[in-house]
Amino acid sequence: MITSDAIIWNAPNEPHPARAASQRSYSAVAKGDLEEWLTVYAEDAVIEDPVGPSMFDEEGKGHRGRDGISAFWKLAIEPIDTFEFTINDSFANPDGNTCANIGQIKTSFADGSHTTTDLIMVYVVNDDGRVASMKAYWEPARTMASFTQAPVA
């Protein structure tokens, strides 16, 4: 089990390029480090988070390339004060380029409100070990149902 202040890894952790890339991605997000996060992704990477049309991607086509991925960060990640990733299982394919992580992300905002998202994240890496595709399967309505308003002072 890997544990940091923001990442709890309860899943198998055999060496695997896609699994390692996913862990680097979680770490950069937890630190709020956009530049580090961008180094995890290939220049032409696509992020679909969540898969399909959503408040982050009305057409459901994903965020493509550096500009698209940076825009996704500003829209979906930057407003969050803290992240806690808990990965409960991870399935990796034998050829080493894909893994699917099953877990939960708890997010907190500066005002004290928070959400919990149960999800499956699928990472595909290129020959350089950088993420070429990341698809996160989760339901925005379920996340919003978990929203807890900050206490009123």
Model-derived regions, located:
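Short, cysteine-centered beta-strand-loop-beta hairpins and adjacent loop/turn segments enriched
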Residues: 79-81, 106-116
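Short beta-strand edge/turn micro-motifs at domain boundaries
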Residues: 2, 118-146
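Short, acidic, Ser/Thr-enriched surface-loop or helix-capping motifs
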Residues: 42, 109, 125-126
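A short hydrophobic beta-strand element
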Residues: 94-105
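Short, surface-exposed coil-to-beta transition loops
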Residues: 84-86, 102, 115-121
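A solvent-exposed, acidic/Ser-Thr-rich amphipathic alpha-helical stretch
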Residues: 17, 36, 42-94
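Hydrophobic pocket/interface hotspot
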Residues: 25, 37, 45, 65, ...
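Short, low-complexity N-terminal intrinsically disordered segments enriched in polar/charged residues
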Residues: 1-39, 43, 151-153
